[in-house]
Amino acid sequence: GLGDVYKRQSIDNVIINDIFFYDEGFKRNSNEVRTPNGNGSYGWGIRILNLSDSGNLENLTIKNSIIENISHSGIRVKGRLDNKFKNVNIFNNKLFKTGGPGMVFNSTYNLHAYANDINFSGSPDDSRKWGRGSGLWTWGSTLGLIEKNKFQNANGPADSAGCHIDFNCKDIVVQHNLSKNNAGGFVEILGNNYNCSYRYNVSINDGYRIKGKGNNFQEGKSFWLSGFVGNGNERHGPYNSYVYNNTIYVNEDVVSKIAVDKNSKGVLVANNIFYYKGETAMVLGDQYKPDTGGDGSIENVFFENNLFLKDHWPKEVLIQPSKSVIGDPFFKNAGGELISDYFPLNIDLIKDKGIDITNIVNDSIGLRIGLKVDMDILGNPIKNMPDLGAIEIN
């Protein structure tokens, strides 16, 4: 009934495929993919939303399921911003060729999304599909742990990162994931987000999209802090973003683009390996209300102790590295498909060369889950000082 709280819903071991609203051959208007979520009718995989004024769901689990060939989102969970779904556990699911995002978590509190395999989100292989979508994204959510997932081959003219943190979130941690070949990019944190983090992930060839090519209206970006908080609203944030111990590899035929909004406040970037073989470029954030650029200085920045293949972080970006290490980590198999291909063989350059991560200046919170990490992306214990990148040399 109205105002009731329903506890413990579980979806387990379900197979969902070929879900379309229209018959084969239906073609969507080319502007449809430019709207924030699509305005037309679609088939969805699992869609859970709160249409009540005061009712709610708690302890929601979706696990061990396969969702394939859907015209929009694979899994979309949508609570209310003022009455969030509580305790959402999504694990061990396989999502393949969804026309929209793989998973969307809107207005959740205490989300754990782990060990999911999301491939070809935003798939354009059927004209009935939306053709845009990140592997996973959150909006209006607080306390989220997104870990041990694979985000691969996200496609679309905008967004379509491996995993992005949309606006109005707090305490979302993205860790121990593989992010590979996603058009939109790797790190994407939007506005009005507080204390969010990407740590101990491996990113391979993310952010290759070129604005203006085909239908693309956003640049792909390797690293993007965006103050966007919705159409027509004044940009602000993100606040206190922690990006550390990631291994980021981009091959020579991709320009690695970086966008940092001047409204960002509090940024920590440390212990990462930025292996950009090709060119790099500063670009402006390009959502529906674009970043106007211009001078600005971002307060409370700690951008130190990162390894770069070359000294080519773009000079126009409003955050600039210091105390960097320049060198080649000698990955076991640079350009490979697997996390283990990015095991660094240059031990002297990497081992115990990380620094302990501490709170950003004027941030009393850090990360609620804790800044210290016990294991690397492969499950190796972190001993002594942390190493550089996502893989600990034991």
Can you name each region flagged by the protein language model?
Residues 322-393:
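C-terminal accessory segments
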